[in-house]
Amino acid sequence: MKNKNPFNIFFPLSLDKIENLEKIKKNCSSIQYAWLSGYFWNLANQTPSRLICEKNEFFRKDNEEKIITIISASQTGNARQLAKRFNKYLKNENKKTNLIDAADYNFKKIKNERFLILIISTQGEGEPPEEALSFYKFIMSKKAPRLENLHYSVFGLGDVSYNLFCQAGKDFDKRFSELGGKSLLHRLDSDIEYESNYIQWSEELLLAINKIDVSTCSVFKKNDKKNFIDKLNYTKYKPAVATVLLNQKITGRNSTKDVHHIELDITNSNIVYTPGDALGVWYQNSSQLIKQILKLLSIRISDKVKVKDKIITIFEALKKNFELTTNTKHIIQKYTDVTQNKFLKKIISDNKKLNNYVKKTPLLKMIYDHPKKLSSQQLISILRPLKPRLYSISSSQSEMNDEVHITVGVVKKQISGTIHLGGSSSYLSQFLKIDDSVKIFVEEKSNFRLPENKDVPIIMIGSGTGIAPFRAFIQQRDNDKATGKNWIFFGNPNFTEDFLYQLEWQKYLKKKLLTKMSLAWSRDQKEKIYVQDKIRENGKELWEWVNQGAQIYVCGNASKMAKDVEKELLDVFSKNGSMDIEESSEFLNNLRITRRYQRDVY
């Protein structure tokens, strides 16, 4: 039995053809060899494009046409938007692509990939986004396959003010290399101002792909540097304008929290959203805060400054273009450079002191403690560009039609007797009035979705404003007349002051749409009770729901509540499912892979 020849461009003849050549070879003289050489060379002496096409034909005969897989792993939507842009960019170069979210990617088949592009953000303490957790755990495990045939590139998105800047991208890049993958292009770690980095990276990466991939016969031509942005109705950089219908405080007067329910009219925007999505809001800085900063730096509000090739007043620039409520190590370092302040020089020379100073010192306080006369251009050179903030949508469009609702917790910090407010949360809760306009866009959260099967039970776990998406969920279940059971765990400090949307939840309980509600009030008694305590208390029943196919949803703080909840879920599975901790962890990971465990954490 003859073995098949591994037919490829480096050895492009089948065994039968080689045998025929051997027969000819036996009966030829040296002169005939020379003539045959010239004859075949003449046939081969064609245009490069023709040769490339013929070469490609060889690949098509024995292999499927190579597809470039583009994976987005996004926390706030930036990675997803860049992945969409890069996908369109490649398609315009006649490349075959497969654009997919990390949550939908079948990572166990990664060994079959030839080209893989990963665009990934980092959350928390250097962790991958929620939708990439399963992929991350798999690729870091002993189960990960060798990737000698893989050509890859990683584009990392992050915030340079964090110690573990772009760590998720770094981890994937290192691991792909350890498994034998070949990097098409050096990994790019990009801060929030990523546009110019992306354009250069995308062009260089296309060139790198073209050196290896000849699956198309088109001649490469340099693209317009603008690249292609998907023509969505509304995006982060092309937001819709909504009108405020209602802005109502929903915590009690004695509450330690200030939470507002905000309703926006989207009648004229044709915006479409789904329960689980987030609403992006472009906020404006407080006029009072701007005036305080300018006064301390001896800058007139009418001074002109250049922003994005436009000349505007410094007041207008600070109002809409720069962050004023967030301090970072880079801002402190830049402010130290322009002021040459001795105290700040000592701070930045010690990383531990610098980290502590960042946590305790807002931008305004730093300037107040160390004022210096600056020019308007010097001021904006140290600031970060303003970013929109994302809020979980707390309404179902099926119920609310031309409205979108959000639940906003005001960020407050008291430092040295002064209250410092969050820029976006204070803008939404305190400055927006009825009929005011606000710029918005929808950030799709495809990995935080209700089950398609309306008979499937769901378990919702949230604390504080983490209840917001579950209000949308229950409205949708009501509209769909879903028959699946619904159980919510909710925690906040006090029953009388902090029971968000109390009357609505009681209504759903009364009509038996809400099957069960487990409440945790941390300050209503001496011993603090949190949602994880309620999970432990109801562990046996929760395990029964899981065995009935229930999907689990968690929304809230990533570093505290969500971690404590996950730890308790692992313990519940271990105790009630007769598993050790490793088996329990594997069980939870399988729930995540099958979309039965979904989180929206921040």
Swiss-Prot record:
<dbReference type="GO" id="GO:0010181">
    <property type="term" value="F:FMN binding"/>
</dbReference>
<dbReference type="GO" id="GO:0005829">
    <property type="term" value="C:cytosol"/>
</dbReference>
<dbReference type="InterPro" id="IPR017938">
    <property type="entry name" value="Riboflavin_synthase-like_b-brl"/>
</dbReference>
<dbReference type="InterPro" id="IPR008254">
    <property type="entry name" value="Flavodoxin/NO_synth"/>
</dbReference>
<comment type="pathway">
    <text>Sulfur metabolism; hydrogen sulfide biosynthesis; hydrogen sulfide from sulfite (NADPH route): step 1/1.</text>
</comment>
<dbReference type="InterPro" id="IPR001094">
    <property type="entry name" value="Flavdoxin-like"/>
</dbReference>
<feature type="binding site">
    <location>
        <position position="359"/>
    </location>
    <ligand>
        <name>FAD</name>
    </ligand>
</feature>
<feature type="domain" description="FAD-binding FR-type">
    <location>
        <begin position="237"/>
        <end position="451"/>
    </location>
</feature>
<comment type="similarity">
    <text>Belongs to the NADPH-dependent sulphite reductase flavoprotein subunit CysJ family.</text>
</comment>
<comment type="similarity">
    <text>In the N-terminal section; belongs to the flavodoxin family.</text>
</comment>
<dbReference type="GO" id="GO:0050660">
    <property type="term" value="F:flavin adenine dinucleotide binding"/>
</dbReference>
<feature type="binding site">
    <location>
        <begin position="389"/>
        <end position="392"/>
    </location>
    <ligand>
        <name>FAD</name>
    </ligand>
</feature>
<feature type="binding site">
    <location>
        <begin position="157"/>
        <end position="166"/>
    </location>
    <ligand>
        <name>FMN</name>
    </ligand>
</feature>
<dbReference type="GO" id="GO:0004783">
    <property type="term" value="F:sulfite reductase (NADPH) activity"/>
</dbReference>
<dbReference type="InterPro" id="IPR001709">
    <property type="entry name" value="Flavoprot_Pyr_Nucl_cyt_Rdtase"/>
</dbReference>
<dbReference type="InterPro" id="IPR001433">
    <property type="entry name" value="OxRdtase_FAD/NAD-bd"/>
</dbReference>
<keyword id="KW-0560">Oxidoreductase</keyword>
<dbReference type="InterPro" id="IPR017927">
    <property type="entry name" value="FAD-bd_FR_type"/>
</dbReference>
<dbReference type="GO" id="GO:0019344">
    <property type="term" value="P:cysteine biosynthetic process"/>
</dbReference>
<feature type="domain" description="Flavodoxin-like">
    <location>
        <begin position="68"/>
        <end position="206"/>
    </location>
</feature>
<dbReference type="InterPro" id="IPR010199">
    <property type="entry name" value="CysJ"/>
</dbReference>
<dbReference type="GO" id="GO:0070814">
    <property type="term" value="P:hydrogen sulfide biosynthetic process"/>
</dbReference>
<keyword id="KW-0813">Transport</keyword>
<keyword id="KW-0249">Electron transport</keyword>
<keyword id="KW-0274">FAD</keyword>
<dbReference type="GO" id="GO:0000103">
    <property type="term" value="P:sulfate assimilation"/>
</dbReference>
<feature type="binding site">
    <location>
        <begin position="74"/>
        <end position="79"/>
    </location>
    <ligand>
        <name>FMN</name>
    </ligand>
</feature>
<dbReference type="InterPro" id="IPR023173">
    <property type="entry name" value="NADPH_Cyt_P450_Rdtase_alpha"/>
</dbReference>
<dbReference type="Pfam" id="PF00667">
    <property type="entry name" value="FAD_binding_1"/>
</dbReference>
<feature type="binding site">
    <location>
        <position position="564"/>
    </location>
    <ligand>
        <name>NADP(+)</name>
    </ligand>
</feature>
<feature type="binding site">
    <location>
        <begin position="528"/>
        <end position="532"/>
    </location>
    <ligand>
        <name>NADP(+)</name>
    </ligand>
</feature>
<keyword id="KW-0028">Amino-acid biosynthesis</keyword>
<dbReference type="InterPro" id="IPR003097">
    <property type="entry name" value="CysJ-like_FAD-binding"/>
</dbReference>
<keyword id="KW-0285">Flavoprotein</keyword>
<feature type="binding site">
    <location>
        <position position="325"/>
    </location>
    <ligand>
        <name>FAD</name>
    </ligand>
</feature>
<feature type="binding site">
    <location>
        <begin position="121"/>
        <end position="124"/>
    </location>
    <ligand>
        <name>FMN</name>
    </ligand>
</feature>
<keyword id="KW-0521">NADP</keyword>
<dbReference type="Pfam" id="PF00258">
    <property type="entry name" value="Flavodoxin_1"/>
</dbReference>
<dbReference type="InterPro" id="IPR029758">
    <property type="entry name" value="CysJ_Proteobact"/>
</dbReference>
<feature type="binding site">
    <location>
        <begin position="407"/>
        <end position="409"/>
    </location>
    <ligand>
        <name>FAD</name>
    </ligand>
</feature>
<feature type="binding site">
    <location>
        <begin position="522"/>
        <end position="523"/>
    </location>
    <ligand>
        <name>NADP(+)</name>
    </ligand>
</feature>
<keyword id="KW-0288">FMN</keyword>
